[in-house]
Amino acid sequence: KFCYNYGELEDIPPIGEGMWEIGGTKFYEKDIDLLLSIQQKPTGIAYVYLEPFMEIEKYYSIIKKFSDAQVYQHLYTNGTLATEETLKALGEVGLDEIRFNLGASNCSDKVIENIGIAKKYIKNVGIETPMTPEFFKSFFEKKQAILGTKLDFINCAELHLNENNI
């Protein structure tokens, strides 16, 4: 309920099959090498559109390209579709950071387990989720398990409000 575009997704035009939006401009993956060779490379990239694990295999090659160019990259997920295999693959292609929206799953045991698995393969692993009353309650009920994952950070300071969720 507290995603950036809650209730507005049908109004957002699709990026386009095989395309990536970077800095407001759409690129085909095949053009990324050219982009990196002629423009100043970005200092960082955040993968924030929808749930990446629905088609995570499409992310591997693009993450690898930016990793090879030494661009810091982080990915947001609710974590429900992550597996050890996909988390390991993300680490192998060079993802620097993964941020789990633990509130989206109401502190699901499976997602907490995936946070621990991610720590084995990805450099920086954390929680970034809005601090809602429901999340606060669930978090404190499962606090020991969450902290036991050895995650690197917890960011619970934000709310993404729009006319559809207030």
What is each residue range found by the language model?
Residues 1-27:
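Canonical Radical SAM [4Fe-4S] cluster-binding loop centered on the CxxxCxxC motif
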Residues 2, 65, 89, 117, ...:
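Alpha-helical scaffold elements within enzyme catalytic domains, especially in hydrolases
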Residues 9, 41-45, 163-166:
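Conserved mixed alpha/beta catalytic, RNA-binding, or beta-rich assembly cores of soluble enzyme
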Residues 36-107, 124-126:
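Conserved SAM/AdoMet-binding glycine-rich loop
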Residues 1-8, 44-47, 127:
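N-terminal pre-triad scaffold of radical SAM enzymes
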Residues 112-166:
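Conserved C-terminal portion of the radical SAM core fold
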